[in-house]
Amino acid sequence: MVCQHNDELEALVKKAKKVTDKGEVASYIPALAKADKHDLSVAIYYSNNVCLSAGDVEKTFTLQSISKVLSLALVLMEYGKDKVFSYVGQEPTGDPFNSIIKLETVNPSKPLNPMINAGALVVTSLIRGRTVKERLDYLLSFIRRLTNNQEITYCREVAESEYSTSMINRAMCYYMKQYGIFEDDVEAVMDLYTKQCAIEMNSLDLAKIGSVFALNGRHPETGEQVISKDVARICKTFMVTCGMYNASGEFAIKVGIPAKSGVSGGIMGISPYDFGIGIFGPALDEKGNSIAGVKLLEIMSEMYRLSIF
C-alpha cells in the first residue's frame, strides 16, 4: 500500500525538524552512527485503511527497543500473563533502559518490567524454538502478519554490530543467570536479541503495527485478530508507563498516547480505535528518544487532541 503525501503533515514535520540539531544519532552502535540526524518521516495508518505520510516514509530503520513490545505480545499469547510475569515485573523505573541498578538492589530474581533491557532479554529467552533460527523465524512470522508484509527481515550489519558491542547486556544476562531467571545459553540469547532489535522496516510498516494495537489486536487490512485483545491491552499499558524509557512520565503529560521508541530513532504511537503512527527521526535526546519525533508527537497531540488522559 502507498501512503498519500499530506501537506498539513509535511508542515508539522518541517516544524519539528528544527530541533534535530539538538540531538545526536546513537554512536555506541557503530552501524546506527551512519544515520542522517536531520531525517524525519511519519506515516499515519487509520483503522479504515487510509494512510497519510510526510517525509521519506520508504526509508528503512531497525526496530531496536520497539521490538520489545512485539516479543512481549508473542510470549504473552504463547504462555499467558501469569507465567510471563513470574519471570519479569510490571512496574516502571526511572532509570535508563540499560541500567543494572534496580536488578541488583530491588529484586535480583526479577527485572522490573519488559521494556528495560534486562526484562526484554528475559522475554526474548522465552520465545519458542529449539535454535536461534527457529525462534527468530517464529518472531519474524508474527511481525510479517502484523505488517502484512512478507518481506520484513533483519539487518545483518546492525545485528552483527550490536552483537559485538553489547557487553552491558551480556553482563545482565550472566547476572540473571546466576539467580536462575533464565537457563538459556547467554550467547544464544544475545544472538537472538540482537537480531530481534535489528528487524528492519519503514514508517508505514510501523504505523500499520500501531493500527493493529489501536484496534485491540485486529489487523485493519486482513481482518485477522493477530494479537488477543487482552494482550494488546497489556502491551499498550506498558507503552504508557514504560514505553519512552525514563521520559515516559513527561511524555504521558505532553503527548498522552501509548508509544514505544527505539535508539534507531523510531517511534510507534497509538491513537486507540483510530490510527497507528510510525515515525523515524534518528537524532536522539539525552534519554534515547527521537528528539524530532517526540516534538512532532507533541505538536500533533496539541493540534488534534490525541491525549487519552
UniProtKB/Swiss-Prot annotation:
Similarity remark: Belongs to the glutaminase family.
Keyword field: Hydrolase
Chain residues that bind substrate: 65, 117, 162, 169, 193, 245, 263
Protein name: Glutaminase 2
Listed NCBIfam families: Gln_ase
Lineage: Bacteria, Bacillati, Bacillota, Bacilli, Bacillales
Gene: glsA2
This enzyme's EC code(s): 3.5.1.2
MF annotations from Gene Ontology: glutaminase activity
Pfam families in alphabetical order: Glutaminase (PF04960)
Subunit structure: Homotetramer.
A GO biological-process term: glutamate biosynthetic process
UniProt cross-references to PANTHER family, sorted A to Z: GLUTAMINASE
InterPro entries on file: Beta-lactam/transpept-like (IPR012338), Glutaminase (IPR015868)
EC category: hydrolase
Catalysed reactions listed for this entry: L-glutamine + H2O = L-glutamate + NH4(+)
Methyltransferase among keywords: no
Signal peptide per UniProt: none
